[in-house]
Regions:
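A charged, aromatic-enriched C-terminal amphipathic alpha-helix characteristic of glycosyltransferases
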Residues: 205-208, 219-240
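Membrane-proximal helix-turn-helix segments that form the acceptor-binding/catalytic region
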Residues: 4-8, 12-41
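Nucleotide-activated donor-binding/catalytic signature segment of Leloir-type glycosyltransferases, i.e.
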Residues: 119-148
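Short beta-strand->alpha-helix junction loop in the catalytic core
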Residues: 17-19, 47-48, 60-71, 88-89, ...
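Conserved donor-binding/catalytic core segment of Leloir-type glycosyltransferases
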Residues: 42, 65, 73-92, 97-101, ...
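Nucleotide-sugar-dependent
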Residues: 92, 140-145, 152-172, 176, ...
C-alpha cells in the first residue's frame, strides 16, 4: 500500500519494539502511534503486529539475509556440538550456557564472535576442556560454522520487552541451514518454533533448565532429526 499526502509519503520502519521501564515504553508508544496514524508502518518482525492497533496500515518485511545455499548435511554427533554465533553480550546468559555443559564430555560448546564481553567470557571458561572461543568471524564463514554445529544457541534475555516479540537473524539462518536452534521461552519466537517443530525453547536464566534440555536432546537424537526435517520443509515452502 502507498500513502500519499500531497507529494509526501511517510514510511515508519519499525526495527525494534519500544523497550525499557514501563513509563518509557508508554511515552515511546504514544510517539510511535502519532507516526503510525500518518504513515505506512513496516515491521521487522511478524510478531510486532500483535502489539500495535490494527486500525493503522502495517506490513511485515523481515530483515532476512540473502542465502545462496542448501541445507547442510546433518547428523547429530557425540559429543553434541553446541554453537553460539554473534556478538558476545548478555554475558549472564552466555555464562549460564557454559555452566550447563562445563566439564561434561557429552557436549562440546563453541562461542564464535567478538564483542564487549569477550574477555570476560574468555576468562570465565578458561581451562574448561569442552568449551572453546574462536573469536570474530567473517559472515562468509557462517555456512561452515552452522555446518559444524548440531545445535545453535539463540536464546536472548526474555525479560526485555523487545526480545519477547522480535525475530532474530538466527531464526532465518537456522531455517536456511536446517540446523536446530534453542530460543528463549516466554517469547513469541520460542512459542512459534515449538508449535511448528522448528526448534526448542528454554529458560535462559536457569542453568538447570538449560542442562536438562541439552541432556534430553543428547539422548533423543530423533527429536533433533525431526526438527531438521521440519526446517528443510519450511524453508522449501518459503522459497518455492
Amino acid at each position: 500500500p502507498r500513502l500519499d499526502y500531497g507529494k509526501q509519503m511517510l514510511v515508519y520502519e519499525n526495527l525494534d519494539a519500544p523497550t525499557g521501564p514501563s513509563l518509557v515504553r508508554y511515552i515511546l508508544g504514544h510517539i510511535e502511534q502519532s507516526y503510525m496514524s500518518h504513515a505506512l508502518t513496516i515491521h521487522a518482525s511478524r510478531f510486532y503486529t500483535a502489539i500495535y492497533p490494527q486500525k493503522y496500515r502495517q506490513m511485515v518485511l523481515e530483515n532476512k539475509p540473502v542465502f545462496n545455499t542448501t541445507p547442510v548435511d546433518y547428523s547429530p554427533h557425540k559429543p553434541l556440538r553446541i554453537a553460539y554465533l554473534g556478538n558476545i553480550r548478555y554475558i549472564d546468559i552466555l555464562k549460564n550456557l557454559a555452566d550447563a555443559v562445563r566439564g561434561d564430555e557429552r557436549f562440546k560448546l563453541s562461542y564464535h564472535g567478538g564483542g564487549p564481553d569477550y574477555e570476560d567470557l574468555k576468562d570465565y571458561v578458561n581451562g574448561v576442556p569442552n568449551i572453546f572461543m574462536t573469536g570474530p568471524y567473517k559472515y562468509e564463514e557462517i555456512e561452515h560454522l552452522y555446518g559444524s554445529a548440531d545445535i545453535i544457541w539463540a536464546a536472548y534475555p526474555n525479560k526485555d520487552f523487545n526480545v519477547r516479540y522480535a525475530i532474530s537473524n538466527k531464526f532465518h539462518e537456522s531455517l536456511a541451514y536446517a540446523i536446530p536452534a534453542v530460543y528463549a521461552d516466554k517469547t513469541r519466537l520460542g512459542e512459534y518454533v515449538v508449535a511448528s517443530s522448528l526448534g526448542c525453547q528454554v529458560n535462559p536464566y536457569s542453568v538447570e533448565d538449560i542442562r536438562s534440555l541439552l541432556i534430553e536432546l543428547y539422548s533423543n537424537r530423533e527429536r533433533l532429526l525431526q526438527i531438521h526435517e521440519s526446517l528443510k520443509r519450511q524453508y522449501r515452502e518459503e522459497n518455492s
